[in-house]
């Protein structure tokens, strides 16, 4: 059983997966800055769920090292006794920022287990930034969640790994967000990648993420070419099983 709730309209979530309750990529206060304000600063259009209103949770999961996923000011406000599970680059950042907190690395080769839920990090074949990870989260019955907030291109080994599991839910961006190549090129690859992933891993349900039309200023917002999805049209695609969550209500998936 999966219970899921948006914590903002971008890419922060509360998820209950069987007996594990976790908060994913929380950015719940203030703006997010990528390096410098002159480069990129963004704000939510709709206020996120207040921190005190988050349902009870066991852990915090961080998928990327970038501020809109690994938001330090939000993490400072969350209880210190909550363990933080993080992919490689986020782990390194968080260990420096919070030396006294329990921070656990989600590896690419050996699964990390928490309350009988396993996590594996899926990394693209890149050594230069931007590097965007995906997460495979699964239970003892091989039911899984595939989370790729910036989309993902699976190689053959990664596709073989993911296909060992029954993916109940795929959470990925539907937005196409492109910068000049020197600044990273495609940040979010858009619907073509959504369809590619859908055909590769056959999820039962699909939910979009990281698609908020945020207020932004700086060089990135001047140079970015953005194509937001038409969610109503996507809802009408036959046999696609897309669930449009545009509010802060919880839904349960069986």
Located regions from the model:
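Pre-active-site segment of Zn-dependent metallo-hydrolases
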Residues: 20-61, 73-74, 153-165
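Catalytic core of the metallo-beta-lactamase
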Residues: 7-18, 113-168, 189-192
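Metallo-beta-lactamase
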Residues: 86-142, 241-254
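Active-site environment of divalent metal-dependent phosphoester hydrolases
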Residues: 9-11, 29-31, 65-70, 91-94, ...
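Structural motif
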Residues: 20-22, 58-59, 83, 143-145, ...
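Active-site HxH/HxHxD metal-binding segment of metal-dependent hydrolases
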Residues: 46-112
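Extreme N-terminal starter segment of soluble prokaryotic enzymes
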Residues: 1-4
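Cap/insert and terminal regions of metallo-dependent hydrolase folds
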Residues: 89, 155-250
């Amino acid at each position: 059983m999966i219970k899921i709730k948006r914590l903002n309209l971008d890419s922060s979530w509360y998820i209950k997966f069987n007996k594990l309750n976790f908060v994913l990529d929380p950015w719940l206060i203030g703006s997010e800055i990528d390096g410098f304000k002159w480069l990129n600063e963004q704000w939510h259009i709709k206020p996120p769920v207040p921190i005190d209103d988050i349902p009870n949770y066991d852990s915090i999961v961080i998928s990327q090292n970038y501020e809109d996923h690994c938001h330090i000011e939000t993490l400072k406000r969350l209880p210190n006794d909550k363990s933080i599970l993080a992919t490689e680059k986020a782990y390194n950042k968080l260990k420096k920022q919070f030396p006294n907190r329990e921070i656990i690395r989600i590896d690419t080769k050996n699964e990390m287990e928490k309350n009988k839920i396993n996590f594996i990090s899926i990394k693209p074949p890149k050594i230069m930034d931007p590097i965007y990870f995906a997460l495979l989260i699964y239970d003892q019955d091989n039911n899984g969640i595939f989370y790729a907030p910036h989309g993902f291109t699976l190689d053959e080994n990664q596709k073989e790994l993911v296909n060992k599991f029954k993916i109940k839910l795929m959470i990925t961006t539907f937005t196409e967000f492109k910068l000049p190549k020197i600044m990273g090129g495609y940040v979010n690859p858009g619907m073509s990648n959504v369809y590619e992933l859908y055909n590769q891993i056959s999820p039962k349900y699909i939910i979009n993420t990281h698609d908020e039309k945020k207020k932004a200023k700086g060089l990135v917002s001047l140079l970015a070419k953005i194509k937001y999805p038409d969610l109503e049209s996507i809802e009408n695609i036959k046999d696609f099983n897309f669930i449009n969550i545009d509010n802060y209500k919880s839904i349960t998936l069986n």
